[in-house]
UniProtKB/Swiss-Prot annotation:
<dbReference type="Pfam" id="PF16575">
    <property type="entry name" value="CLP1_P"/>
</dbReference>
<keyword id="KW-0547">Nucleotide-binding</keyword>
<dbReference type="InterPro" id="IPR027417">
    <property type="entry name" value="P-loop_NTPase"/>
</dbReference>
<feature type="binding site">
    <location>
        <begin position="39"/>
        <end position="46"/>
    </location>
    <ligand>
        <name>ATP</name>
    </ligand>
</feature>
<dbReference type="GO" id="GO:0051736">
    <property type="term" value="F:ATP-dependent polyribonucleotide 5'-hydroxyl-kinase activity"/>
</dbReference>
<dbReference type="GO" id="GO:0006396">
    <property type="term" value="P:RNA processing"/>
</dbReference>
<keyword id="KW-0418">Kinase</keyword>
<dbReference type="GO" id="GO:0051731">
    <property type="term" value="F:polynucleotide 5'-hydroxyl-kinase activity"/>
</dbReference>
<dbReference type="GO" id="GO:0046404">
    <property type="term" value="F:ATP-dependent polydeoxyribonucleotide 5'-hydroxyl-kinase activity"/>
</dbReference>
<dbReference type="InterPro" id="IPR045116">
    <property type="entry name" value="Clp1/Grc3"/>
</dbReference>
<dbReference type="GO" id="GO:0005524">
    <property type="term" value="F:ATP binding"/>
</dbReference>
<protein>
    <recommendedName>
        <fullName>Polyribonucleotide 5'-hydroxyl-kinase MJ1315</fullName>
        <ecNumber>2.7.1.78</ecNumber>
    </recommendedName>
</protein>
<keyword id="KW-0067">ATP-binding</keyword>
<comment type="function">
    <text>Polynucleotide kinase that can phosphorylate the 5'-hydroxyl groups of both single-stranded RNA (ssRNA) and single-stranded DNA (ssDNA). Exhibits a strong preference for ssRNA.</text>
</comment>
<dbReference type="InterPro" id="IPR032319">
    <property type="entry name" value="CLP1_P"/>
</dbReference>
<keyword id="KW-0808">Transferase</keyword>
Length: 361
């Protein structure tokens, strides 16, 4: 059940002939070599990545795979960009364990271009002296701002080869500026490529979340034991007691936590009275504590890579602790330097409870 749900793409050599032509070029090109795969949703990028990696392994090359498709992640954990070094043939990318991951914090890249580009670049740089060939799998976001994301990734990563999987020249406008300096292969989307509905994609993601968080434990981590990032709540300095009293009196709130940074207050509160309040959110931003329930957080090491993910079960503002459910070991917990808040809420059964806007916390 898990394998059937989680794995969309499998290793097969029953693919169009033009894939073998691209493989031949890769085989004969000077190493090390960086390859980016581009294509829309359900265009066969992951199937192609699986094929290329296996064939190149068979030829004796050291291969690295950077999985940056945060919406339909093959190499767990979800909501991250992952680097893996497969050493032997594999059936699908789900079988491969990540070597390093970078936390994005969402399955929707639209508001996270910085994380998408930074993570992909850092992992490619890390792999460059450890592999002959780096294969970068990408999201299916190729129109609108998605085209900008692909352009910026190409500019930052500087691949040697781009393989574009197209139906009707939809990638030509993105890639035309690069054609004179990067080898670009335009391949047709395989006519038998399987399509997945939005609901099927959601079910696949649910199985991946559930698989990742099985065998998890609860850890309580103090505010002062780590850096807490990815939220404005802990930026700047904690508000003073007289400031807290004034705000509570003025707006009839119970303030659980408050901070101020660069002239702006951020308050976590509960309403004591149901009443209209005229508040300039550029000066005073307020958050209900429930917004943090079941929030995905990244557990970050000293090198800014993601050790693993956690589900933020509760924030105890009174005792200044975070209650986090995570499958990582107690030994790895000791290596956490930052807990970075994401923007997707998920329960331990894999159910996605909703995405948050980047500025909402």
């Amino acid at each position: 059940m898990v394998d059937n749900m989680i794995s969309k793409a499998y290793y097969t050599t029953e693919i169009p002939e033009d894939r073998f032509e691209a493989l031949s070029c890769i085989k004969d090109s000077q190493k090390p070599l960086k390859i980016i795969l581009l294509g829309g949703v359900d265009s066969g990028k992951t199937t192609l990545a699986t094929f290329l990696a296996n064939e190149l392994l068979n030829l004796g090359f050291k291969v690295a795979i950077v999985d940056s498709d945060v919406g339909q992640k093959s190499i767990l954990p979800p909501a991250t960009i992952s680097l893996a070094f497969p050493e032997t043939n594999f059936n699908n990318l789900y079988e491969i364990k990540p070597y390093k991951s970078y936390f994005v914090g969402s399955t929707a890249p639209i508001q996270f271009f910085g994380e998408m580009i930074t993570g992909t670049k850092l992992l490619c740089d890390y792999a460059e002296d450890k592999a002959d060939i780096i294969i970068v799998d990408t999201t299916g976001l190729i129109s609108g701002s998605g085209a900008d994301l692909k352009r910026m990734k190409i500019e930052m990563i500087k691949p040697d080869i781009i393989i574009a999987l197209e139906k009707r020249n939809e990638l030509k406008s993105i890639l035309k500026p690069f054609e004179n300096k990067i080898r670009v292969f335009y391949l047709k989307v395989y006519e038998n490529a399987k399509s997945f509905s939005r609901e099927e994609r959601k079910e696949i993601r649910a199985e991946k979340w559930k698989e990742y968080f099985k065998n998890s434990k609860i850890y309580n981590i103090g505010f002062n034991d780590v850096v807490i990032g990815g939220t404005k709540v802990f930026q700047g300095e904690k508000i003073l007691e007289d400031e807290k009293y004034l705000l509570e009196s003025l707006f009839k709130w119970k303030i659980l936590y408050g901070s101020k940074c660069d002239g702006r207050y951020t308050i976590v509160k509960r309403d004591l009275v149901n009443m209209p309040r005229q508040i300039d959110k550029n000066i005073l931003y307020y958050i209900e504590p429930e917004r943090f329930n079941n929030l995905i957080v990244g557990l970050i090491d000293e090198d800014s890579f993601c050790i693993g993910l956690g589900i933020l079960k509760t924030i105890d503002f009174e005792n200044e602790t975070l209650e986090i459910l995570t499958p990582i070991s107690e030994e790895d917990i000791k290596n956490i330097r930052e807990i970075r808040f994401g923007r997707i809420r998920v329960d331990e059964n894999g159910e996605e409870l909703g995405l948050l806007d980047r500025d909402s916390i």
